[in-house]
Amino acid sequence: MQSNQVNLNLLLRRNWQKIEALQINLRHLNSVRFHMKESFGHRMAKCMLCHLLWQKGHFFVTEHPINGSVCDVLDLNTFIVYEVEAEATPSRIKRKLDDYRHPLIEDLIIIDLRKMGLSWEPLLDVRDAIDKASGLRFTEREA
C-alpha cells in the first residue's frame, strides 16, 4: 500500500499541470464508472482494462469528459484514452479521433469488441451464480 502511495505522489508531482488542465477529479481515481447505456460486454471489457492498468501500477479515471465527449478510460500515467467499442466503423473511429484530439492527450486506443469475437457466456454464468447467492435476483440475461 505504501508503494502505491509513493507512486501516486510521483504521478501527481509529474503530471499535476495536465491533471489540473483536464479538470480531473481525483476523487474517482481508479474507480470504474459506467454509463447507463453501456452493454454488459462493454462494462466487462472496461472493468478488465482498468484491472490490467491497475495491475501495472497505473492510475486512471473513467467516464471523464474531454472536449465535450466522455471517454471510457483515461490512463493518468500515459494520458492515453481507451475507448471500448462494440462496432468501430471507420466513421465512428474518425469521430472518436476528432472528439479526443487535445494537446494533453497522447494517444487514443480503440478496443473493438466485435473484432475480438468474444463470448460473454462464461461471465454471465458467474454473474448468475453471484445473483443467486446474493439474493439480488436479476431477471434478464443481457449479452
Describe the residue ranges of each PLM region.
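Acidic-residue sensor for enzyme active/binding pockets
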Residues: 63, 83-85
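Interdomain/boundary linker segments immediately adjacent to catalytic/signaling cores
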Residues: 1-48
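Catalytic cores of nucleic-acid endonucleases
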Residues: 47, 86-142
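Intrinsic disorder/low-complexity detector
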Residues: 1-13, 130-143
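Metal-dependent nuclease catalytic cores that hydrolyze phosphodiester bonds in DNA/RNA
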Residues: 37-65
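Active-site beta-strand-loop-beta-strand hairpin of nuclease catalytic cores
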Residues: 68-82, 101
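Alpha-helix C-cap/termination motif
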Residues: 52-56, 76, 102-106
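Short coil/turn segments at the loop-to-beta-strand junctions that recur within blades
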Residues: 67-68, 90
